[in-house]
């Protein structure tokens, strides 16, 4: 009697560094759209596919993004883990967009309009972005024109 009901534990799906590295097959650094097979599902990215990379190299312009698989539960947050091979800068805004988002293709900063979650880097090597309810698949991107380098990504439900 008087015990609190047990809270359901959160579930996390990960795009691992090993899965990212296995998708790095190109001999150049050009940015292209491709898929990454993962135990958590198929991720779609517009990023460099250079086999020189041991991380996911993305950019916040000209169509750059990471798109999660479509999950069967609402996403509560996305945590991006930056590679220790590159510096992480403070004050860069990252947004999560719904699956209906139209990815900008211009060579300019992305607008934040229509985001379902955002967070700003503080220089640490991970950033958790809370996601509004009702999203089972999302895009993740930096708002500035900078490139960013990810070791792995966690999606929590």
Which role does the model predict for each range below?
Residues 86-109:
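Short, surface-exposed beta-strand/strand-loop-strand elements in extracellular ectodomains
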Residues 153-155:
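Extracellular beta-strand elements of beta-rich domains used
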């Amino acid at each position: 009697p008087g015990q609190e009901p047990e809270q359901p534990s959160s579930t996390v799906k990960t795009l691992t560094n090993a899965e990212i590295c296995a998708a790095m097959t190109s001999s150049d650094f050009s940015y292209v759209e491709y898929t990454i097979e993962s135990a958590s599902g198929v991720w779609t990215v517009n990023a460099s596919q250079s086999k020189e990379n041991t991380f996911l190299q993305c950019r916040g312009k000209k169509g750059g993004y990471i798109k999660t698989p479509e999950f069967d539960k609402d996403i509560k947050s996305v945590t991006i883990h930056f590679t220790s091979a590159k510096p992480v800068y403070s004050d860069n805004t990252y947004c999560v967009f719904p699956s209906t988002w139209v990815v900008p293709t211009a060579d300019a900063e992305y607008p934040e309009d229509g985001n379902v979650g955002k967070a700003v880097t503080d220089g640490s090597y991970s950033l958790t972005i809370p996601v509004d309810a009702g999203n089972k698949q999302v895009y993740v991107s930096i708002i500035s024109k900078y490139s960013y380098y990810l070791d792995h990504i966690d999606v929590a439900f």
